[in-house]
Design a protein with these regions (language model features):
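Histidine-centered active-site/metal-ligand motif
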Residues: 35, 108-111
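Hydrophobic alpha-helical segments, especially transmembrane helices
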Residues: 3-5, 103, 112
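Structured helix-beta-strand junction loops
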Residues: 63, 121-124
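Stable alpha-helical elements in mature extracytoplasmic
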Residues: 49, 53-56, 110, 114, ...
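Bacterial Sec-dependent N-terminal signal peptides
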Residues: 1-28
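Short S/T/G/P-rich N-terminal loop/turn motif that feeds into the first structured element of a domain
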Residues: 18-89, 93, 97-104, 131-135
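Short, exposed beta-strand-loop hairpins at the edges of beta-sheets
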Residues: 103-106, 116-118, 122
């Protein structure tokens, strides 16, 4: 009996520790669809407009229950190269579990409200959507 209990305990420990290592070491972005949006603001030096844009985009991100993961950032101070475009002001990334979720997001009230309240603040928006490929 003791050996069966010990065997089960060792098995559970082994299974649990293997799963933990796999999750912690995974480099794969979660989500089937990666929705990347770049924003060029009309007045990136206008602190009032920048604050309003940040307020509205953060509201969108905090009310989006469809995304698996999300990111909001500004251009990094990486080495200037011909292939690097740091001309945008903000980058927002959402990952979605499926194309269906991404399509629902497009018509979701929080997305439409964000566009309505913030569209006057940008001069350009560029969207890149991609699907996950096995690695």
């Amino acid at each position: 009996m003791k050996s069966k209990i010990l065997s089960v305990a060792i098995s559970l420990f082994f299974i649990t520790s293997c799963n933990t290592v796999k999750k912690e070491n995974s480099k794969i972005i979660e989500g089937e669809i990666v929705h990347t949006v770049y924003f060029w603001l009309n007045s990136p030096d206008n602190l009032v407009e920048v604050a309003l844009f940040e307020k509205e985009i953060k509201k969108l991100m905090n009310t989006n229950n469809l995304a698996v993961k999300m990111h909001l950032g500004k251009p990094a101070s990486t080495t200037k190269r011909g292939v690097v475009d740091n001309s945008y002001n903000y980058c927002m990334i959402f990952t979605f579990p499926s194309l269906k979720h991404q399509r629902i997001y497009q018509d979701h009230p929080s997305h439409l409200i964000f566009i309505d309240k913030a569209k006057h603040l940008w001069k350009k928006v560029q969207v890149y959507d991609s699907t996950t490929e096995p690695i």
